[in-house]
Amino acid sequence: MPNMLEVYKCVHCGNIVEVMHAGGGDLVCCGEPMKFMKEGTSDGAKEKHVPVIEKTATGYKVKVGSVAHPMEETHWIEWIELIADGRSYTRFLKPGDAPEAEFCIQATEVSAREYCNLHGHWKA
C-alpha cells in the first residue's frame, strides 16, 4: 500500500506519480504494479544529485548538488520538491534552466527531493 508523498514510476511507459492521498491497493500502470522510487539508490554522483537547502530572507532556495548538475537536452533535473511542515511544493525544470528553485514560504521542518531523468530520485 502506497504512503503519502511516496513517488512511483511505471517501468514500461515512464509515468511518474506522487501519492497525494494514501488509500488501499497498489498503484498500477500499463497493466503492472508501479515501482517505488527510493531516493538516492542509483549510480549517479551524489555531489551532483543530493539537493542542498539554503534558508533565505524570503524562504528557501534548493540547489541540486554541491557541484552544479548538467541541464542538457539528454540529462537534466525534471523537478525539485520542497517538503515544508508536511506540505509539498514543486518546481518543474527544463533543459537550459538553472538546477535550482526558490520557495517563498516560512517553515520549521524542511527537506528537499529532486528527480534526474537519468539517475532518478534524490533527497536531502
Curated annotation (Swiss-Prot):
Its cofactor is Fe(3+); Cu(2+). InterPro entries: Desulfoferrodoxin_Fe-bd_dom (IPR002742), Desulfoferrodoxin_Fe-bd_dom_sf (IPR036073), Desulfoferrodoxin_N (IPR004462), Desulfoferrodoxin_N_sf (IPR038094), Desulfoferrodoxin_rbo (IPR004793), Desulfoferrodoxin_SOR (IPR051233). It catalyses: reduced [rubredoxin] + superoxide + 2 H(+) = oxidized [rubredoxin] + H2O2. Catalyzes the one-electron reduction of superoxide anion radical to hydrogen peroxide at a nonheme ferrous iron center. Plays a fundamental role in case of oxidative stress via its superoxide detoxification activity. Its EC number is 1.15.1.2. It comes from Nitratidesulfovibrio vulgaris (strain DSM 19637 / Miyazaki F) (Desulfovibrio vulgaris). The gene is dfx. One of its GO terms (biological process) is removal of superoxide radicals. Homodimer. SUPFAM superfamilies: Rubredoxin-like, Superoxide reductase-like. Keywords: Detoxification, Electron transport, Iron, Metal-binding, Oxidoreductase, Transport. It comes from the Bacteria. The lineage of its organism: Bacteria, Pseudomonadati, Thermodesulfobacteriota, Desulfovibrionia, Desulfovibrionales. Belongs to the desulfoferrodoxin family. It is an enzyme of class 1 (oxidoreductase). This is Desulfoferrodoxin. Disulfide bonds: none annotated. CDD domains: DSRD, SORL_Dfx_classI. Catalysis occurs at center II. Fe(2+) ion of center II is the electron donor and is converted to the Fe(3+) form during the reaction. Is organized in two protein domains. The N-terminal domain has a fold similar to that of desulforedoxin and contains a mononuclear Fe(3+) ion, center I. The second domain contains a different mononuclear iron center, center II, with a Fe(2+) ion.
